[in-house]
């Protein structure tokens, strides 16, 4: 997915120097706090292993997934010469301050403020920036202020989450989630309990869950949703890889392809991987970032 000693597997937009792999144990991690434009703070981690990195990677998480889930991937990148910034969206894990029922964070805030703050922080290093977006962390990118600061984008399991792009029973099951289950649960609890999100395990603040459901009822999902900065997907000039996983029920091929076509003047490069290609039984929506699975692909 990402190669060192070349052009980040996509084009010459990010030129990588030939960097020797750092010795075991050389990875360093520094907890930091990111200040957003609206004054909110996010818990984040810088990960690196060489004093002079050749590029910066910003990892933008999936909905309800804590940054620690991506730490193995961040370590792997650091050992190959990247400086890596991972962070928790507001209302999630380390960036949840106080009871979740009182949290006013929205998914729109994630794009408008949180991803924008991470991107601005990375830009201070004056190095090429690669944005890695998992699921929502990829499909929100085109609504992020300052996206032009990035040099390249890789998304994994990012998609148009409108239920109409699924097929068979999953299509109607997802419609029930967006129209009934998620609104009812959110109203009943005052937030969306993490156990309903599968592998991620992080509960969602009320308005985050509402934004997610409201957008997913729309044919254009977040791409033309009101209340966000203007959409810039088609204006992004750097290389874009949009990855799908054959057994990812959260992001079927049609939904991933719908996102890919929106990037740049000619669309992003649509790529796919299957468990069989890697000699695995399953990958799913979250597997690529687990060390035992991801090492076959990274």
Please give the residue ranges for each predicted region.
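Short beta-strand/loop motif that positions the catalytic acidic residue
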Residues: 236, 242-244
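N-terminal cap/lid segment of alpha/beta-hydrolase-fold proteins
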Residues: 12-48
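Alpha/beta-hydrolase active-site loop
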Residues: 104-123
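Conserved alpha/beta-hydrolase
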Residues: 67, 74-98
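Alpha/beta-hydrolase-fold enzymes
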Residues: 132-220
């Amino acid at each position: 997915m990402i190669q060192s000693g070349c052009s980040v597997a996509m084009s010459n937009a990010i030129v990588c120097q030939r960097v020797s792999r750092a010795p075991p144990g050389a990875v360093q991690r520094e907890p930091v706090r990111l200040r957003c434009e609206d004054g909110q703070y996010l818990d984040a981690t810088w990960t690196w292993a060489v004093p002079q990195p050749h590029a910066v990677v910003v990892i933008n998480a999936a909905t309800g997934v804590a940054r620690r889930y991506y730490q193995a991937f961040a370590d792997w990148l650091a050992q190959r010469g990247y400086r890596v910034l991972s962070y928790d969206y507001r209302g999630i894990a380390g960036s949840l301050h106080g009871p979740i029922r009182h949290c006013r964070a929205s998914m729109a805030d994630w794009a408008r403020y949180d991803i924008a703050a991470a991107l601005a922080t990375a830009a201070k290093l004056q190095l090429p920036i690669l944005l890695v977006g998992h699921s929502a962390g990829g499909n929100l990118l085109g609504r992020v202020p300052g996206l032009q600061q990035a040099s390249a984008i890789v998304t994994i399991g990012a998609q148009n989450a409108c239920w109409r792009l699924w097929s068979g029973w999953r299509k109607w099951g997802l419609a029930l989630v967006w129209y009934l289950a998620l609104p009812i649960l959110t109203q009943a609890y005052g937030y969306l309990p993490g156990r309903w999100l599968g592998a991620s395990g992080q509960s969602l603040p009320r308005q985050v869950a509402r934004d997610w459901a409201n957008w997913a009822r729309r044919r254009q999902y977040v791409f033309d949703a009101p209340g966000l900065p203007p959409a810039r997907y088609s204006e992004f000039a750097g290389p874009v890889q949009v990855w799908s996983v054959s057994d990812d029920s959260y992001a079927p091929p049609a939904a991933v392809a719908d996102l890919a076509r929106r990037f740049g003047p000619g669309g992003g490069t649509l790529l796919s991987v299957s468990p069989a290609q890697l000699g695995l039984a399953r990958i799913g929506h979250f597997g690529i970032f687990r060390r035992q699975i991801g090492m076959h692909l990274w």
